[in-house]
Amino acid sequence: MLLQPACSPSVFPRPSAAPSAMHGSQKDTTFTKIFVGGLPYHTTDASLRKYFEGFGDIEEAVVITDRQTGKSRGYGFVTMADRAAADRACKDPNPIIDGRKANVNLAYLGAKPRSLQTGFAVGVQQLHPTLIQRTYGLTPHYIYPPAIVQPSVVIPATPVPSLSSPYLEYTPASPAYAQYPPATYDQYPYAASPAAATSFVGYGYPAAVPQALSAAAPAGTTFVQYQAPQLQPDRMQ
């Protein structure tokens, strides 16, 4: 007959406390923990605590520092004793702490973004070519990213990728001008004579004359006028 050794209850470890009991000991800081950003680098835990003491009791005030250098990273966390104190501390979203404007918000909400002042000017590169063509009557070949779609805006004299379009490959030295009488030269974006280049008609979007044209006609103005509706693609080929 085999005898089983008696085992005392002390041999086996006692079961640990239930997880709910352990989590119950931790206090909920959802509405009491405050994120403080925009702090100056000389702010310490003591100075951060000193500022928030005016709103109520504080359980913890910590400035986050860099592990390697030990310097402040510009933000920290403050845990208030109750929710009412946290609400009073967050009433001013941009207080002055240690001589610098900071931003304060509940930690679970994250950093509160500052208001951005958006302008009404819209760049050409932000608009779809189809929308520009329908609204302003311009073709995609005459859409220049550096400019704003507004009247009386001068396009800067910088190299623009759209100027390499096949519609603008005519130069004064090209024999293509011999195929057209002088009266038809005004139909093209670049005028053949300096006198024709001095007038501004059409949409009012002047552009800089390329170097080849400025060398051939030094007496003309540095801006010529595009006439997009008068272009004929079959004559450009």
Curated annotation (Swiss-Prot):
UniProt keyword annotations, A-Z: Cell cycle, Cytoplasm, Differentiation, mRNA processing, mRNA splicing, Nucleus, RNA-binding
Subcellular localization, as worded in the UniProt entry: Cytoplasm, Cytosol; Nucleus
Domain of life: Eukaryota
Single biological process term from Gene Ontology: cell differentiation
PROSITE patterns for the chain: RRM
Start and end residues of each RRM domain: 32-109
Disulfide bonds: none
This protein's record includes keyword Nucleotide-binding: no
Region ranges (Disordered): 1-24
Coiled coil: none
Major place of residence: cytoplasm
GO cellular component terms listed in the entry, alphabetical order: cytosol; nucleus
Family from the record: Belongs to the RBM38 family.
UniProt name for this protein: RNA-binding protein 38
Gene transcribed to yield this protein: Rbm38
